[in-house]
Amino acid sequence: MASKGAGMSFSRKSYRLTSDAEKSRVTGIVQEKLLNDYLNRIFSSSEHAPPAATSRKPLNFQNLPEHLDQLLQVDNEEEESQGQVEGRLGPSTVVLDHTGGFEGLLLVDDDLLGVIGHSNFGTIRSTTCVYKGKWLYEVLISSQGLMQIGWCTISCRFNQEEGVGDTHNSYAYDGNRVRKWNVTTTNYGKAWAAGDIVSCLIDLDDGTLSFCLNGVSLGTAFENLSRGLGMAYFPAISLSFKESVAFNFGSRPLRYPVAGYRPLQDPPSADLVRAQRLLGCFRAVLSVELDPVEGRLLDKESSKWRLRGQPTVLLTLAHIFHHFAPLLRKVYLVEAVLMSFLLGIVEKGTPTQAQSVVHQVLDLLWLFMEDYEVQDCLKQLMMSLLRLYRFSPIVPDLGLQIHYLRLTIAILRHEKSRKFLLSNVLFDVLRSVVFFYIKSPLRVEEAGLQELIPTTWWPHCSSREGKESTEMKEETAEERLRRRAYERGCQRLRKRIEVVEELQVQILKLLLDNKDDNGGEASRYIFLTKFRKFLQENASGRGNMPMLCPPEYMVCFLHRLISALRYYWDEYKASNPHASFSEEAYIPPQVFYNGKVDYFDLQRLGGLLSHLRKTLKDDLASKANIVIDPLELQSTAMDDLDEDEEPAPAMAQRPMQALAVGGPLPLPRPGWLSSPTLGRANRFLSTAAVSLMTPRRPLSTSEKVKVRTLSVEQRTREDIEGSHWNEGLLLGRPPEEPEQPLTENSLLEVLDGAVMMYNLSVHQQLGKMVGVSDDVNEYAMALRDTEDKLRRCPKRRKDILAELTKSQKVFSEKLDHLSRRLAWVHATVYSQEKMLDIYWLLRVCLRTIEHGDRTGSLFAFMPEFYLSVAINSYSALKNYFGPVHSMEELPGYEETLTRLAAILAKHFADARIVGTDIRDSLMQALASYVCYPHSLRAVERIPEEQRIAMVRNLLAPYEQRPWAQTNWILVRLWRGCGFGYRYTRLPHLLKTKLEDANLPSLQKPCPSTLLQQHMADLLQQGPDVAPSFLNSVLNQLNWAFSEFIGMIQEIQQAAERLERNFVDSRQLKVCATCFDLSVSLLRVLEMTITLVPEIFLDWTRPTSEMLLRRLAQLLNQVLNRVTAERNLFDRVVTLRLPGLESVDHYPILVAVTGILVQLLVRGPASEREQATSVLLADPCFQLRSICYLLGQPEPPAPGTALPAPDRKRFSLQSYADYISADELAQVEQMLAHLTSASAQAAAASLPTSEEDLCPICYAHPISAVFQPCGHKSCKACINQHLMNNKDCFFCKTTIVSVEDWEKGANTSTTSSAA
């Protein structure tokens, strides 16, 4: 390799140290005196001076090897220190005992130092024990869950319920529950968090045991340990499922050494001394320059030193690295020597100087070391660097994290090192995503947030309560000063975090560089391959938790990736005017169907990819010019058929036998919950003779298109970016897409991966972090209540005052802590910049969906997650970022709302989308969308034809699809217009706890008259739209209310039993749901009757009379069940069972009343008479049910007792805040009208013989005869029956026609055809 900046090329491959034949020639490189001075300057030390005999001779390259050997000679005591040590038993290399020292199911890393719990409570110990002296080891906490860390003896027996600390001779510290364990448990120590380091110390001279957390002693935990014959203590840990740690017994330098205690594994003292001496020589080379002309040595700063190809310098370095290279392959020496040297460079110099020196050092490593040596060295270096970054404590200026990131950047700026690390280390061996994570401090005191944010503040009225909260008070001057001081502290914190984030973005910019292709493939294309495999692990391994990257890492990685991506996108636009800005980014639709990007086994909108290829192959050929090979289709189909029948390969079956006897099982490294530096292979330890692992079937093979397609690993730059004859990723451009590319194709694939990342776990984590804000609100309410009680408490009650004062202090301290932690969360997760990232991702998805929709049937190839991300990212902006930052200030906010509304309105019933889950998500998103005024207005702004199409889909018959959400949408469009339907919370429910005012169900009514008008117009169009829709609504109402009555009968029977009994909470929930469905269906009927009354009252329509009779029948059934005093419904409501809070008289009775008022009061006189006659003709009609609405008592039946005079009666007049005076007057008018009409009907009615009654309903006289079978019934019954079934009700003969029938008439007249 030619060193950059060198004056000549020097290949170390052909270099060998001087031989005897060459000695004379070599010594003539420079003057003998100058060479002697130079070598003495490099290889001499006041501490390790050479012997006198050697010092009298001039130092040259002939005697330099002898001189170096003497320099590196180590005392015999240090050499022998690696042997057996008194007080310790076992191998000198200490690891976890994977052969027999464990219990339960565990995943152990390849280095046998990291472990992941894979069962309820697994335990494992080390291979080495101690019986005398003072010892310690460190545990790196990767997850903060339930774990017990400490010591045990070999006689301890554990199981999956009892672990370390649960037996007599085992001792443990549990930072999750902040306790210590030795059979019994007591409080001890502090809570730990992911990223902490626990030091476990044992003093067997004094018989004590203690722990440290991040180097701070937690005090003595146990005393009087059992010692003596047979008592030796092993490091041990018990951990629950998914929890993970990594041990350091001394194989690496201890992060927090303790004076007087030694690690279980001795450090390589002799090699450490040699490495430090060689490093001193190396540093001397970098600080000295030869001037052969003047014959003198010049001191020079390391940052200005350059390798200029001078033979003297090259030979000197060759001698150094001849001894140094083998040492730099050892983990301990890399971290203790090389890492310290490089960090010193970064800490002392400017970033530019540091990068220059590190670049020179890496050049020399690649030049003078064999490839395998420098690769091992770089691997260990990055592992140590990542470990240091992840497990460093948070300090106020984040200085430690900044230094580690600056060193990482300096290393990655070296092109050859960067490509090696990308290809082999960053994604394969260690978790490079950790570099982009900023951990949240659990203990704000240790993170220095008290100094950074000295003044705390929290809102006195929760922003989650909504802007209309009646408790909002005007801010006082003192509160204003506190808030401003708090905001200044938050701003200081944000600026410091932004420094770290900018360094993390620089790392990704280096990994996304595509101009460094001089020595092979550019970094960006290596990154793309590794990034896609990373996504595959997290998308395909959801059932295996250890395979998943923690979501908190994903959130940070996504934001840094978006920043780097947009930087390169806009940079490309600057040099290519025809490209687009990142603000206009989207994924072209051909990416989804041309097979160039692997989407693993992720679901497409139209179903399975193999199915889409078969059914849409003609469309692919005609629209995209892509031909699918029929043989490949056939083989893919056969693979799908045989998938469940394929036996496991032999090589996958053999490890299962080892597993059954508790042996190690190599696995593809999950490692996401364990040490950040694990090898790719793990060992699966199990004490049970069962297998929990099944071999995964290889992912689908690459599909043949018009040009060749390759697997992710085989792709080249040309396959991605394309060439003059190949469009690369954009193969198969549909005619709707522009010819000019948006940007570089590789950036499109990165963007696609970013969208997938959000769907995998980022959205879930964003919702989880809101919990800190909720905690602040709850404690603020508790503090406010306590202060109110203090003001009201009498001064003579000093005991109560003391308790309240104590509570006030506890709440204030907790709020101080939480407000500082909330500032950290807002700065790292919910900042304005992060909000803009999520908003940009939302707009990318919207444009992608819009462009995909234009391709017609090919839209089915789009992965489902694009629609999911569009829905979820909007939800995150509104619910998670909204309380902190205003959405209205986002650029193009109104336009984005409208575009999202158009997508939801069009695709919630799109036949191209077949997945049940995504269809439900679209329906729920639309239902939520119409609950909020600003988003409902956006729905009203979409083009008229789209609005009409949406309403038409909402009015489709309910039997053909899931209908509950559809009905909910229609109800929301009506809420605020119905009778007594202006409430947000039901009148009988009190606001007893803090609730999220952003919930859709708690929004104030915001009806849409525009969409109501579309509904009215559609119901009047065509003879079948209204009857089919209303028939389905009436059917579902009949079902829902019948189910509700049946369930409350069971609940009532259970409540009346004398023995103790419990009602299943799920049954109560289903019962309440059926009640809510009944109410919402009644409201839809009320809306329909109000908007289009002629559907029921214009009897020139063939179905109007039938629909009106069915409606009257159902209304009477509901009234009779609900209004009967001391009846079933009344008794269940009185019980006030938890889960049935929504079940009450008011919501269902006002819905029924609204329908009756519309039929009997508001319409024309002729229509009112028709409705009245039908209602009174129904045999279930009872006037007392109407009287009940206004609280008028029911006259007692003969033989029954009079009702209690003090019994509280239901009356609509009691709800003056919810029902207007005009509405009450209409109810009174309706009651008067029905009282008069029922009296007249009773006087005019004639007795009817039983033979003349309809044999179906026994309520109306026979008026129709069926042809050809001749059976008879009333018209209402047969018309209702024919709406759903064309067979005779009695004999199942197909009905051809229905004819009018009158008793005594000789002929019948055909009234309607079946």
Curated annotation (Swiss-Prot):
Cellular compartments annotated: Cytoplasm
Reactions performed catalytically: S-ubiquitinyl-[E2 ubiquitin-conjugating enzyme]-L-cysteine + [acceptor protein]-L-lysine = [E2 ubiquitin-conjugating enzyme]-L-cysteine + N(6)-ubiquitinyl-[acceptor protein]-L-lysine
Residue list for modification Asymmetric dimethylarginine: R683
Biotechnology: The WILVRLW sequence, which specifically recognizes and binds NFKB1 could be used to generate a tumor-suppressive PROTA.
Occurrences of domain B30.2/SPRY (ranges): 74-254
EC primary class: transferase
Claim: Acetylation is one of the keywords in the record: yes
Name this polypeptide is given: E3 ubiquitin-protein ligase RNF123
Annotated source species: Homo sapiens (Human)
Species lineage: Eukaryota, Metazoa, Chordata, Craniata, Vertebrata
